[in-house]
Regions:
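Short amphipathic alpha-helical segment within the helicase RecA-like ATPase core
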Residues: 1-254
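A generic structural signal for tightly packed, nonpolar segments enriched in small/aliphatic residues
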Residues: 190-486
Length: 486
């Protein structure tokens, strides 16, 4: 989508559709107000009124789109309104439209531009790769939007450029997580990473089973040993270590399909377990955005990719695994596989001596019970890092909620016959899972993001968030990296 920025109102520019964003306290332009037979458009948040102008107004159609009260406008509100605008344009089969925002917002123009661009790009997203025989109406896409503003045009343009970069990276992550498991295998994730490196200049290394065996990736190998699609460990590196810039490691769970293994899941909704690599997708998307934005930090993305299948060669309840760290793990439940692959990835991250390690994983159903689908669970060994993620969540709308990581949760994962066990009982499952992971991060500042409730939705929760994969984590992590240390 081409998004351009101009000064003015856009009400006198010929177009098939002009979208005028309105606020509750702001009067409509006189020539617009005259079109309303009753004062039924009050600018309430997400309120829409479609008009067919006459007189001096040039657009064929005019959509009034409410933003709510000026005092309560947030970047996420702008994001949602922009998504509604592009969806209305698509419904009307309008290829290019204008969006006018004349309200005097207290938000910086760059923030406004970024939020609007994200809303337009994310709101336009649809996953139709495997649809055949689509009609022109079904495949129709909006090609361009001109933003009209009374604010600083240059600053708004900077924000738009950033927003499009971040949104496209989010859509890349959505595509990976929406992809069918016969297509998105561990090898396919490795190929996607290599292609990403070719596009962006990221340095990419993909370790295959012989190298995993040689180097001792016992966790990833165990989870993947029951599948005909062998596991991979993927390293993506941006920038170089520097005395004046931090190194941050992002670790993603990449279980490309999770049957539960020998501890097999029920058939109901097992098809959705293709999204169990959403953490890996978020890492790949974030690394794309980091490279395209040219951020100053040294950032390393690590993807632990495996397929968890039941077979004669699958790992079993009762097995004891030796992980990359040398720590041993007693397997009580093969469906608690995410923490086992992450154990190798988190320990591997320590070799970079990072200022922060952040992992993302669709790890537990327990976090969904606790927080639903509106917040990602956050558990951390470092409060300063957690606070930065909380702020980034408020800015991006990818909100996180901090849960405790007390020593009792770590102790609950101790085994009688190995160093650790991979299941901690019925209660506090998200917390004991984090307690398990804590054993593999050393003394480095670390945050664990359990995205099991936010990575996939069965219905649209926000206009820019369609059903299916949400791409959660990309915008959150990019915001953290852009503001890191501030």
């Amino acid at each position: 989508m081409l998004i351009t920025v101009q000064n003015g109102t856009g009400l006198h520019a010929p177009t098939d559709l002009a979208v005028l964003v309105t606020c509750e306290e702001s009067p409509l332009p006189t020539e617009v107000a005259e079109l309303l037979e009753a004062t039924d458009h009050r600018g309430r948040f997400k309120q829409t009124t479609l008009l067919y102008p006459r007189g001096t107004l040039a657009p064929r159609r005019l959509l009034l789109l409410g933003l709510g009260k000026l005092a309560t406008v947030t970047p996420d509100g702008l994001r949602q309104v922009a998504a509604l605008a592009v969806q209305q344009a698509r419904e009307l089969q309008v290829a290019t439209c204008t969006l006018s925002l004349q309200a005097h917002l207290t938000l910086p123009p760059a923030v406004v531009g970024q939020a609007l661009a994200e809303g337009l790009e994310l709101g336009a997203y649809r996953y139709q790769r495997y649809k055949t025989g689509l009609s022109s109406e079904q495949s129709f896409a909006v090609e361009g939007v001109t933003l009209y503003t009374s604010a600083d045009e240059a600053a708004l343009h900077v924000g738009v450029t950033t927003g499009q970069t971040v949104a496209r990276a989010t859509c890349f992550a959505r595509d990976l997580a929406n992809g069918p498991p016969n297509s998105i295998t561990p090898a396919a994730l490795g190929q996607a990473a290599q292609e990403l490196g070719q596009r962006t200049g990221l340095r990419v290394t993909v370790l295959e089973p012989p190298q995993l065996v040689e180097q001792g990736f016992g966790g990833i190998l165990a989870v993947g040993q029951g599948s005909a699609n062998p596991p991979r460990f993927i390293v993506l590196e941006y920038g170089q270590p520097a005395a004046d810039q931090p190194t941050l490691c992002l670790v993603g769970k990449g279980v490309t399909f999770d049957t539960g293994g020998i501890s097999i899941k029920s058939a109901d909704k097992m098809d959705e377990m293709k999204m169990d690599m959403s953490g890996a997708a978020a890492v790949l998307g974030t690394m794309q955005a980091v490279a395209e934005l040219g951020l100053p930090q040294h950032v390393v993305g690590l993807v632990c990719a495996a397929e968890n299948m039941p077979s004669a060669t699958a790992y079993r309840p009762g097995d004891i695994i030796t992980t990359l760290s040398g720590k041993t793990v007693e397997v009580l439940n093969t469906d608690a596989e995410g923490r086992i692959v992450l154990a190798d990835g988190l320990f591997y991250a320590q070799r970079y001596k990072p200022q922060a390690i952040i992992d993302l994983a669709t790890l537990t159903g327990a976090i969904v019970v606790a927080l639903g689908q509106h917040a990602t669970g956050l558990m951390s060994s470092d409060q300063a890092l957690a606070d930065q993620l909380i702020r980034a969540g408020e800015t991006t709308g990818e909100r996180v909620w901090q849960m405790p990581l007390w020593s009792e949760y770590r102790e609950a994962m101790e085994s009688d016959i190995a160093d650790l066990k991979n299941a901690g009982g019925r209660y506090g499952g998200a917390l004991t899972a984090a307690g398990f992971l804590a054993a593999f991060v050393g003394d480095y500042p670390w945050c664990h993001l359990d995205i099991a409730g936010t990575a996939w939705v069965e219905r649209s929760l926000k206009p820019y968030q369609p059903w299916g994969a949400t791409g959660v984590g990309v915008r959150l992590l990019v915001e953290l990296l852009r503001s890191y240390g501030q």
